[in-house]
Amino acid sequence: MEKQKILDQIKGGLIVSCQALEHEPLYTKEGGIMPLMAKAAAQSGAVGIRANTVRDITQIKEVVALPVIGIIKKDYEGTPMYITVTMKEVDALVACGVDIVAVQGTGARRPDGSSAPEFIRAVKEKYPQQLVMADCATLEEGIACAEAGLILWVLRCVATHRRQKDATISIMHLSMNFPKNALQRSLQRDISITRNRQKKRWKREHSLW
């Protein structure tokens, strides 16, 4: 699918995350459940799917014609990063034909010492035609990733580690206490890229751009 067609299709719509990790009830070794979740989302009007692992992405793309945002979650020693952390994960996602590669765009360093913007530049250099999305938690992170060449970002409550209950104060404040409209508006003023939000909705209007 062409890049502009993907962007036009997901603009202003609902992207549904269809993921299950090994310790979660909907996970099975053979897969097959996430594609059903994706089909249900598509039938209900979703404009895109976010999925984890090459297996689930491949199975989902076989049953729905929606753009798929792909990630690979993996813990690495010495870094709190866990969402598409290295080029190895990016290579696997691109090889399976994912429409958008999502990487963690928060402030921690990757195992090789690179920052999120540095990693994004490396990805864009290796795969110049690939759409890449960054998971950001602060205004500064969003701007830095945009300056690295992104045209997509997702505002998430990204903890510093998926097993860590306490993230930074600012992230927990965003996650637990109020809708993230103010941060989103700040990003919209400072950078001109496509925006996406994930999780925490108090009212319908909180999901509107």
What label would you give each PLM region?
Residues M1-T28, K61:
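N-terminal amphipathic alpha-helix/helix-capping segment at the start of soluble metabolic enzymes
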Residues E2, L26-K29, R50-I69, P80-K88, ...:
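Active-site-adjacent beta->alpha loops and helix N-cap segments on the catalytic face
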Residues G78-C96, A137-I151, Q184, Q188, ...:
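Catalytic cores of alpha/beta
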Residues K11-V16, V64-G78, K124-A137, K180-R189:
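Short beta-strand/loop segments at the ligand-binding rim of alpha/beta enzyme cores
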Residues Q19-L21, Q43, I72-E77, C96-R110, ...:
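Glycine-rich phosphate-binding active-site loops on the catalytic face of alpha/beta enzymes
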Residues G48-T53, I57, I69-I71, D99-Q104, ...:
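Short beta-strand segments at enzyme active-site cores
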Residues Q43, V63, A95, E125, ...:
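Residues at the C-terminal ends
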Residues L36-R50, C96-G97:
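Catalytic domains of carbohydrate-active enzymes, especially glycoside hydrolases
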